[in-house]
Amino acid sequence: MQLLTDEVNLLCGASYRPQEGGLYRRAGTEPVRIRTSEGTEFIDKRRVRKMGQDGREQEVRLNSYAEIKRRKGMFEEVLESICHGASGSGVGKMLGVSASQVCEGWKARSRELLAEFRGRDLSEIDVLAMMVDGVFPGKERCVVVALAIDTEGHKHLLDFEEGSSESAEVVMALFAKLKARGLDAGVARRLLVTRDGSDAIAKALRHFWPDAVQQECLVHVERGLCAKLSYKHQAEAVEKMNRLRAVEGAEAGEEAFEDLLKFVSGKNLAAAESLDARKDGILAFHRLNVPATLNVTFLSTNHIENVMRNARQVVGRVSRWNDKTDQVARWMGVALLRAQEGFRRVRGHKELGSLAAALEREGPADLSLHSAAAEMGKAA
C-alpha cells in the first residue's frame, strides 16, 4: 500500500499539509476488490480529485492502483511457479519481468505467508495428541516441526524451530514458542505424543509435559529392528510387528510384544535387548485400552512424515541457505502452509472421545511454561 501513499503524497502533499494552491486534494478512501491468481482481495483505495479548468472536480486515476493489482497477481504466480520447481529466471521470462522483480515478488509473498502461519492463535485448539519430527533442508540446517491433532480429528501444523541438529535445545525452544502463542495442551488431560526414538524429543517432552504419554513410532521400531536382523528373518519380524499394530488393548499388546521379543531373542541378542529396553514406549498407546481403529493414526508418525515429504519438494530446490537472513523460515512457512491445504480428518476420528477419556487425569497438573522452565533450570 506504500505505492498508493507515495503517489497521493506526490500529488496532494503530505497528510495534513496540503499544497497551497494545488490542483489535487485527497477525497478519502473506499474499499475495492482486486483480482489475483488466488482469487479476490479487498484493499483500501485512496481517492484523489483534481480541479479542472472549468471549476469542476474530476476523479484522478492513480497509476499505483494498477501497479498494485499487477504486483498482487505477479506475486501469486511467482509463488506457484517457484513451488512447482521453476527457476527464478524461467519465471521472469514467463511473466515478462526481470529476475530482480521475481525475487522481490517471492520474498514479499513468502514473508506474508510466514506472518500468516505464525500469527494464528493456538489457544482455541483443543489438543489431544501431537507429533514432532525434523527435516534437514541443508547439511548443517535442521527444522523441527510440531503437528497437533484436536479432539475432532483435525490436524494443525503449529510451528517450527530452526537449528543445526534435532537437539533437545531446539525442541525445547519450539515447545516454548508454542506455549507463548497460547497452546493449551496437556492441561485438561494428559498429552499423547507419537514420536520417533529421538532422546532429544523425549527429554523436551518430559520437561514441558511430564506426564505425557509418549508412544514410539512403530514404523521406526520396525525399521531399526530389521536393520539388525539377517534378511531371511526380516519377513517374519515384519509379520509379528503387523500383529502388534493390529491388536487392541494392553493385554493383547503385551502378548504380541512378548511374541515378537521371543522371536528376536533367538536371532539377535543386541536387537532383543534394544527392543526390550523400549517396551514402555512401544506399548504406551496399547495401555490406554482404546479401540484398535485408532492404531493406524497414533502408532506411527506417518501424518507428520507426509508433511515433511511435501515440504522437501519445496525446500529441496534450494542449494545454498543464507543463515543471516529469514530465508529458511520463509521457505518453511510456505512449504507447511501448502502441505496443510490438503489436510483431512484422521482415520478413526469418531472414536477420539474414548481416547480423550483414557487420557484424563484425576487432578489438574501444573504444566505452565514457568514450571517447565524451572524444570529445565534444575536439569541444567
Residue spans for each PLM region:
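Residue-level signature of catalytic and energy-coupling elements of molecular machines
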Residues: 4, 133, 155, 193, ...
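Short, amphipathic alpha-helical "recognition" segments used to contact nucleic acids or chromatin
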Residues: 71-85
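RNase H-like nuclease fold core
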Residues: 10, 17, 24-27, 35-36, ...
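Acidic/histidine-rich catalytic cores and adjacent linkers
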Residues: 5-9, 14, 88, 246-380
